[in-house]
Amino acid sequence: VAKTALACTILPDSPPARLIEWSRAAEDAGFSGVFMTEANNDSIACSLALGLHTRRIKLGTAITNIYLRHPNLLANEAAAVQEFTGGRFILGLGTGHRESNSALGIEMGIPLTRMRETVKTLRAALEGGKTGPRVSAKLPLYLAGVSRPMVKLAGEIGDGVIFNFFPPARVKEALGELAEGAQIGGRDPKHIEATLFATAFISDDLEAARRPARKLLSRYGALKFYGNMMAHSGFEREIAAIRAAGRDGDAAVKAVSNELIDATLLVGSEARVRERLHELCAPGIGTAIVFTNPVNEDRNAAVMRTIRALKQ
């Protein structure tokens, strides 16, 4: 893996002070960046806070939901972070999921069209002008890509792409789609960074690590975008069973095979996780963004263990 970044978010067991501590530890360990996820928190505001407590490490969002903010407001927020952090910010953009957006009363329309329009407005605003930031800002825009059309769009108009839950075969396929999109946009794909978001469950007890991993995949496999991608990647049987389970959570968990876990997550001992990370990050992946979930220990211990295990 060329570079490794840490991913984190504000949770009951990871308050702001912990995020600052982890970011500093990741910086000292040679990690390339810290990416904030967006789960009932503001990923951009959190990135600014972490930037003010670090010196060199990149700050990013993985991802910021484009449906929650007007593009011009998003441009001003992101430009402010870029200015305060000395140009260390990467804005990762995603559409979220129909299931979560509809719960907020958001009608998504056509996500691909919305993403294209958002990036266009962002680019124009970031160049300055009446609706743009106080000063023009050079800001890398990374697009979360799951489906083939969104990955191609990232190649056409983005500075990078963020993959998540991608088995190695899907990574290889998606890198080809990214190159196709770059060709459409008249761009060199070498200038578009491909990143892989990888969730880790680290424990010397493999079965203990697989239990929470199974629960995670039973939830994400039920989502349309991820479920379709996993089914397309050779896990049709598992996804069909997860969807058939409906609200029966136990049945959905049982439908997740060890093969699906190993193809999409980092699970097991520190040595096994390092090996799996190398296998998941095919040639062409520039940065692995690792998010850690604890296994029979508190989150702080789990995150610090991950930082030590993946020290650059």
Residue ranges and their predicted role:
Residues 1-312:
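Active-site-adjacent structural elements that line small-molecule/cofactor binding pockets in enzymes
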